[in-house]
Structures are given as structure tokens and as C-alpha cells.
Amino acid sequence: MTSNIGITRAHTNIALIKYWGKENKELFIPMNSSLSLTLEAFYTDTKVELTDALTEDEFYLNGTRQDEAATAKITRFLDLFRSETGDTRRTRVESLNFVPTAAGLASSASAFAALAGAMNEATGLQLPAQQLSTYARRGSGSATRSLFGGFVEWNKGDSNENSMAIPVDDANFDIGMIIIVVSAAEKKISSRAGMELTVSTSPFYEGWVTSAATDLADIKQAIKDRDIHRIGAIAEFNGMKMHATMLASNPPFCYFEPESIIAQQTIRTIREERGIPAYFTMDAGPNVKVICKASDIPAILEELGKVFPSEKLIPT
């Protein structure tokens, strides 16, 4: 019996310039480039073992063997590496998620980035991180950006080979995030379904794609300048424009809950009345992420704590 083992840790990320909509659904090539901040506090550890002792792939998540449907998705991803290497041995995948699901943080980004990294090691491919990100992308679009720390761009590209992650900045300055947990309930409309509806029906969508390119260029300059006000303002504007495309879809849909609006208003009040640079962004869900200086997190938590219970506030 022969086996090869690979072990990798990958961190989740929060998009500041959003990805919303696919140009190529099969290859997960997006309609626009995006940019995220990797969260060092939240990650997935994955171990893979390629072995001829198995007749089918096995997938364990947090110690529990997963069902056929979940394993089938993993198998499709593993097949990308089998196709590249010619190694058809079945694989045991063991993943541990250290991502607070109650915070509404998608673990798919860190999960598929970690799986790609582990397979890269076990198969002996040893692809550089940028090239490996083209594999991670095929599992989950946002996983493309989880191969690097700090600020990371997912360059849209126009092919499987060049739609990849590009490290922008190590984020080694005074920047942090707070997650406001509004709801941990399952979304009524999945991100995939929401994207498809928006792309096909929203009259605002074309403008969103154009403006996202401008936002990306602007935020990269703001990052270079270490300007937290500009970083936050651009991210807030970009996120709200994305949600506006959904409101104009047919039929319209919205991920906001009443508490999402309260959180937005509270953050604006902190910014305008306390003079603390605090900005918000939201993904395809009701939870709100606060972009701020890491040194301001205690003061912002104090203000948010007047509105939300402490267990709903997660600093990173």
C-alpha cells in the first residue's frame, strides 16, 4: 500500500471590492476583478491522503464523515488534480474549520484554498501560489484570494490560466475588522442563485461592473497610501452598489434584515459623531463587517455594545 499526505492551512477573507456574477460558470471566471482582506483569525486546516487502500473518496469535516452529496463536490475538485497528474488514487480528506459559522463567514474560501494546498503538496505538483489559485477558484470563487495573506486581488482574466490571485499588500499597518452578527440562519436565496438572477435581469448590473473596475483601482491606491478613510469609503460604496443591483433585479431580492440597517446607521453615527474612521461592508447575507483601524476596535466595540449584545460582535 502506498500513500501520499499533504497538510495545509488557509485563511478566510472578506471582499472589499466585491465579486458578483460569473462570466464563465464552468470555470468560475468572474465578471469583474475583486479585492479582499485575509482574516488571520479564521482558517481551515486540511489533510489529504492519497492511497490505493480506498475505492472511493472520503470527506470528513470537523471529525464527521460527510454525505454523498458533499463528498461528490469534493471529488469533482480532486479530479482537477487527478487530470493534471494522472494519479487516480482515491483520497481521504480531513478538514477542520476554525471559522465561526454563526458569524456568517463563508468557510468555502478557506476550505477550498486549504484543499488545493494540501493536494498540491500530496501530488508533488508544487505549483506556485498564483498558479495554485486557479485551482482553488474552481472550488469556490472567493477561495482564489485565500492563497495569500493581506490584501489580495482576484484578477478577472479571460481564461482558466490567468483568472488568478495577485498579492497586493501585506496589510502590515493599523487596519482591522469587526463582524456584527445579525443572523446565522440559512439564506433564502443562495449566492449562486442571486448572482445569476442579478446578471440576467438587473438593469443596474452593467454599471456595477464598470464602476467596480474604478473602485478597484482607487482602493489599491488608498492601500498604497495607508489611507483607512479612503479604503473604508470605497469599500462601503462598492458594497452598497452591489446590493443595489439586487434590489433592481426581477424579481427584486434583498439580503438585508432590519438589524442590518440598524448596524449601518450605528456605524455612520460612530464615524460622524465620534470622528472614528469606521465603515461597513456586506456580502450576500445580513451580517455587517466593520472596516476600521485595529487600534480603534475597543472604542468601536464600546459604541456597538450599546446597540448589540457582546456575543454578536466578533473582532478580528
Show where each model-derived region lies.
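C-terminal nucleotide
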Residues: 3-10, 169-316
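Fold-independent oxyanion-binding glycine-rich loops
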Residues: 10-13, 19-20, 96, 109, ...
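Gly/Ser-rich oxyanion-binding loop with an adjacent helix/lid
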Residues: 83-172
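Short, glycine-/Ser/Thr-/acidic-enriched flexible segments
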Residues: 13, 21, 42, 53, ...
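Conserved hydrophobic/aromatic beta-strand scaffold that supports enzyme active sites
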Residues: 45-47, 151-153, 177-179, 289
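ATP-binding N-lobe of GHMP and related small-molecule kinases
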Residues: 1-103, 117-127, 303, 314-316
